[in-house]
Amino acid sequence: MRRNKGKDEQEQHVNDTLIASGFQKVASRPVLTLNKAPGPGTFCRESLLGERKADFILGLWDGRVAAIECKVSNSSTNSVKRLNNDAAVKAEVWFRDFGTRQIVPVALLSGVYKIHNLESAQNRGLAIVWAHDLNELVQWIRQTKT
């Protein structure tokens, strides 16, 4: 239960931060092809993206789609499950479904993670952002306008 509470709070914080940064929230829906994804400047909450669910799907300003997975790990042992066996696997599936130029998988992390698990996830194509500094995520999103 503790993990779910932390994850729920993290997701609400992301939701509020995206809205405060000018993104518009749209209805969740299955995204089986990228033309069904939220358009630039919009996002939806948990939705099927290809074969796997994403916590958030964002339409980036440059036409790509970001898939954000929120993860909370209370121990370095759990970090393998949360990051490598879930979020990084989803990244690989989304790359297969949509291609590496069209989709940007992001793990938004809170808690305790082993360095080698973080490196492994990044090597598999997962961008990592820390939940305590969502300004970093907002700045990155803004850079997709240029």
Name what the model sees in each region.
Residues M1-D8, T77, A107-G111:
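Short, charged/polar micro-motifs that form catalytic or ligand-binding hotspots
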Residues M1-R3, G39-R45, N74-N78:
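Surface-exposed cleft-lining segments at the edges of enzyme active sites
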Residues A27-D62:
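Active-site metal-binding core of divalent-cation-utilizing nuclease and nuclease-like domains
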Residues L83-D97:
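A short, acidic, amphipathic alpha-helical segment used as a generic capping/interface helix at domain edges
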Residues F56-L58, D62-N74, A87:
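Conserved catalytic cores of phosphodiester-cleaving nucleases, focusing on short active-site segments
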Residues M1-G22:
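Interdomain/boundary linker segments immediately adjacent to catalytic/signaling cores
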Residues C70-N85, S110-V112:
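Short beta-strand-loop-alpha-helix junction that forms the active-site gateway
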Residues Q102-T146:
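Domain-level recognition of nuclease-like catalytic cores that cleave nucleotide substrates
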